[in-house]
């Protein structure tokens, strides 16, 4: 093989972004733009339930952060969920509720009940997700923007709701410990 061609091929291989991440066939972008600000991929991991791979979750922040408490102070922030299988709306909502309940007091849960009702309506309207669907949750200016496959579904006001939802993944009792660690870059 011609040495010039070999050099060009090797150079091309070296130009692949070092931060490019692929999990279970899902290629994650190194950056995302939320509210006009560039965010970096902080970390990503695989959500499992029993023996099944359910989704890939990724966290985007203004800068890399490894402490959950510091993530809650960062703004804007994004959680992106790439579905790997069919999941019913009730099952998805139940998992989120369990994550929130495990990390919030009864008083905190009571305070965000109207926002939880709004989220439940949206998830119910989305219905059963399938492999390849993407749910994006942006946290901006005290509100939570939920999109499904690129289409805005709702904007839910309230910083307390915003934090409670993020804590389902990153709180002291996350839905899955190794997913939390992965989203925090570990």
Residue locations for each model-derived region?
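Bacterial N-terminal signal peptides that target proteins for export
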Residues: 1-7
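Bacterial N-terminal signal peptides
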Residues: 7-15
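Sec/Tat signal peptide C-region and signal peptidase I cleavage site
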Residues: 16-20
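N-terminal structural module
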Residues: 21-73
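Mid-length scaffold segments of soluble, non-membrane domains
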Residues: 64-141
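Short strand-turn-strand beta-turns centered on an Asx-Gly dipeptide
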Residues: 148-151
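Flexible glycine-rich active-site/ligand-binding loops centered on an Asp-His dyad
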Residues: 153-179
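Cysteine/selenocysteine-centered motifs that mediate thiol-based redox chemistry or coordinate metal-sulfur cofactors
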Residues: 178-186
